[in-house]
UniProtKB/Swiss-Prot annotation:
This is O-acetyltransferase pigM. The gene is pigM. Disruption phenotype: Produces the angular tricyclic shunt intermediates monasfluol A and monasfluol B that retain the omega-1 alcohol. O-acetyltransferase; part of the gene cluster that mediates the biosynthesis of azaphilone pigments (MonAzPs), a complex mixture of compounds with a common azaphilone skeleton very widely used as food colorants. PigM and pigO are involved in the elimination of the omega-1 alcohol with pigM acting as an O-acetyltransferase that synthesizes the O-11 acetyl intermediate whereas pigO eliminates acetic acid to yield an intermediate with a C10(11) double bond. As colorants, MonAzPs are widely used in various food products for centuries. Moreover, MonAzPs also possess wide-ranging biological activities such as antibacterial activity, preventing hypertension, lowering cholesterol levels, causing hypolipidemic effects, and displaying antiobesity and antitumor activities.
Length: 508
């Protein structure tokens, strides 16, 4: 698809299939002034001595420089298309006025809970907790893209004088193309591609509707409330022990967490989930399969992600389950998939948004997304004393579905469960995380010591007489590169690594 000029300096380009799916999901809760799958990332920052003066001005300038580097940050959705305006220094300044915020009072959790659907991304600086919070709609970017984007942002802070200060006269060439275009998917489908796509999506949806989940509050007409998350982070020594145990058994950390999640659903899930096998939708990174240069960091600002639906059999033991999952992780990729992306997303949208009677029980499946070692995409330490001490990623959930994220940062494994407060209490989420931890300890013969449990702000106020969570106050020790061994989060495809990409029940 090409850009078409509608007015002088204004260009419009239709959303492609994958973008259209994400955009429709973005608009699905707009009548409630809410956003499903809104992406967020929280960074707790030690700015070092060089950024102690005029910090707000420096952050704002770096945010503008990031916009110049990634003009996709300025795109605005219009119907089922994206709009680009030719920019100059003044328009970039206006964009910053619409997207950069400083709040001296709010916690990161309060920013996320109160976020509304916006046509542009946002960056918040919260001086009370020394936090930077990035928010974006999912049609614009994915999880690993967010990590690479933030790495570029902190690289700008590291050397602000080296960044171009004004946008190019026409930036369309720097705007990352759709997934289908980046993958080189033909615009005209053959009969073989149509057949492959139809069978692929039929099989995907057949498995996806079987996803298992946990009992939820309320009835079928209960409206969503605030998005929330509970998380547990394990010490570097515990993370090392878990990695070593997985390596000894020749399984990945992702497979171990996946199997532990399945066992947790078998024990704590809905009654029908306890009796059935466990199927979940799991995101995979498609960036390694894209054509150059779209497989590079220069194209962080786009959604290049797919999904698989591995199954865990209830009748198997833990090691058998992990072995089966490893096979699923290694065998999912098919070159035909990349070629057939356009009909795949067409059939997927048809199935996803078709008018039908609501199911008797609203879906409440749990999704697993492993981001792996964050430092592969986003450094923790920069020059001049600039450090990202803590990283947290998530999405805003508006349905009864939950999402489990796993990643390591500074050598510490984090498990984070995203949910909506209308359907789950924080105590339920903690119970789920605790059960996953216990399964891992039992099956891998390790002891996992939580560094800190991330508590809701209100409970933290009560326990510590402060409104900031412990996770944003603790500073972990620096971990050697050797500790960064979360290779288990890498899903080896048939030829290239495919990393779980941090999305919900995604389009593939």
């Amino acid at each position: 698809m090409t850009w078409r000029q509608t007015e002088p300096g204004i260009f419009v380009k239709d959303f492609d299939g994958a973008e259209k799916v994400y955009y429709k999901i973005f608009t699905s809760f707009k009548p409630l002034n809410r956003e499903h799958w809104g992406i967020y990332a929280i960074c707790t920052v030690n700015f070092g001595p060089s950024l102690n003066t005029d910090r707000v001005a420096i952050l704002r300038s770096a945010w503008k420089a990031l916009r110049i580097t990634f003009p996709g940050l300025s795109l605005v959705p219009i119907n089922v298309a994206k709009l680009y305006k030719v920019s100059d220094a003044q328009s970039v300044e206006e964009w910053a006025g619409q997207t950069f915020f400083v709040d001296a009072e709010k916690t990161p959790e309060e920013v996320i809970a109160s976020a509304k659907p916006r046509d542009l991304p946002s960056l918040y600086y919260l001086p009370a907790s020394s936090s930077v919070v990035f928010l974006s709609s999912h049609w614009r970017i994915d999880a690993l893209g967010t990590c690479m984007l933030l790495d570029r942002f902190f690289s700008i802070l590291e050397q602000p004088s080296l960044v171009e200060a004004t946008p190019a006269p026409d930036e369309r060439g720097k705007i990352s193309p759709s997934l289908e275009d980046a993958a080189g998917s033909p615009r005209t489908s053959t009969e073989e591609m149509e057949k492959f796509a139809g069978e692929y999506i039929a099989n995907f949806h057949k498995k996806a509707v079987q996803t298992s989940g946990f009992p939820f509050k309320g009835g079928p007409n209960t409206l969503p409330s605030n998005p929330a998350q509970e998380a547990v982070m394990f010490s570097p020594s515990s993370t090392k022990s878990l990695l070593a145990a997985c390596k000894d058994r020749r399984i990945s950390v992702t497979a171990a967490i996946h199997a532990a999640l399945a066992e947790t659903v078998f024990v704590l899930g809905m009654s029908e989930s306890q009796a059935a096998d466990f199927t979940t939708v799991m995101a995979v990174n498609l960036r390694p399969y894209l054509q150059p240069p779209y497989n590079s960091r220069d194209h962080a600002c786009q959604t290049y992600v797919g999904s698989i639906t591995p199954q865990v059999l209830r009748s198997k033991n833990f090691l058998e389950r992990t072995a089966s999952l490893m096979e699923s992780y290694q065998g999912w990729y098919d070159g035909k998939l990349i070629k057939a992306l356009r009909p795949i997303f067409k059939y997927h949208a048809d199935a996803l948004f078709a008018q039908r009677a609501p199911p008797p029980n609203p879906p409440s499946g749990v999704t697993l997304n492993s981001l792996g070692v964050i430092e592969k995409y986003f450094r923790s330490d920069y020059e001049n004393g600039l450090k990202v001490e803590r990283f947290h990623f998530g999405v805003t959930m508006m349905t009864r579905q939950t999402m489990l994220y796993a990643w390591t940062f500074r050598g510490q494994l984090t498990l984070s469960l995203n949910f909506n407060e209308a359907y789950y209490d924080g105590d339920v989420a903690k119970k789920i995380l605790l059960h996953i931890k216990r399964v891992l300890e039992k099956e891998l013969s390790v002891e996992l010591d939580p560094v800190v449990e991330i508590l809701p702000a209100k409970q933290m106020e009560h326990e510590l007489s402060t409104k900031h969570r412990v996770v944003y106050l603790m500073i972990p020790r620096k971990v050697d590169d050797a500790d960064n061994g979360f290779e288990g989060a890498i899903l080896p495809g048939s030829a290239k690594p495919a990393v779980a990409g941090g999305e919900d029940a995604n389009p593939l």
